[in-house]
Regions:
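Conserved active-site-adjacent core of cysteine acyl-enzyme catalytic domains
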Residues: 82-236
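Active-site-adjacent structural segments surrounding the nucleophilic cysteine of cysteine proteases
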Residues: 2-99, 198-237
Length: 237
């Protein structure tokens, strides 16, 4: 079960992914050889989770704030109540939600931004390839990406990145990323090698999702016009 956990602090109950959305103004495309930076964070859009259950809900709320470029006033508890019946967790044990419920909430509440779009979970076998995928989707869609951290116990939002070139112009080297965490830093820069994304090691969902997520790098990603309705597992070589 995804649950918000802070190191050196008593374990917080419940599964709660936390996305912190980082918003900014999307830059105009530049020359392929020019270093590229994009960050969607803005301070008024950030939300801190209201309790141990609501990091996925807080993440959803702030993600949508960053997309809308304003505080939408979404209720974290309303979001959580939407997520839980639609996620893959054991209902007798869960208190928060998981990547499936989180992605469904982002898609359902998208209309509050004034438009419609789809988020889906993705499970990658390579951390660096996963982060490059996240950076490219931020550049292509102008929307943040959710990262599952603490081995499936928490989640944050990747709001931006720095790279050797614009991902829309071809292959690139990812150098830095910007993260918003609903229970920690509202906006923090990490090296690509030092990102908080790590392997999902929880076994509290249905067998199908346990198999899909376990041992992989799991993200909640804004999709293009043809999303995979059941998510996707990507083998990165």
């Amino acid at each position: 079960m995804l649950r918000t956990i802070i190191r050196h602090v008593p374990r917080l109950a419940g599964l709660v992914l936390g996305c912190a959305l980082v918003a900014g103004v999307a830059p105009t495309p530049t020359d392929a050889a020019t270093p590229f930076k994009m960050d969607l964070y803005f301070g008024a859009g950030y939300e801190r989770q209201i309790d141990a259950r609501t990091c996925t809900a807080a993440s959803t709320a702030m993600t949508l704030n960053f997309i809308a470029r304003k505080d939408l006033g979404l209720s974290q508890m309303d979001i959580l109540r939407y997520e839980q019946p639609r996620d893959a967790l054991n209902d007798a044990k869960q208190r928060g939600s998981d990547p499936l419920g989180w992605s469904k909430a982002l898609t359902y509440f998208a209309s509050r931004t004034g438009t419609n779009f789809t988020y889906m979970w993705e499970a990658h076998t390579s951390e660096y390839a996963a982060l490059k995928r996240a950076a490219k989707q931020i550049a292509v869609t102008g929307r943040p990406v959710g990262l599952v951290t603490l081995n499936g116990g928490h989640a944050v939002v990747m709001t931006g990145f720095e790279a050797s070139r614009d991902p829309r112009q071809g292959d690139f080297k990812l150098t830095y990323l910007w993260i918003s965490d609903p229970i920690a830093s509202s906006h923090k820069r990490y090296t690509a090698a030092g990102s908080p994304l790590d392997k999902y090691l929880e076994l509290d969902a249905t067998p199908t999702y346990d198999k899909a997520w376990y041992g992989k790098y799991v993200m909640v990603v804004p999709q293009g016009s043809t999303p995979n309705r059941v998510g996707t597992v990507v083998v990165n070589r």
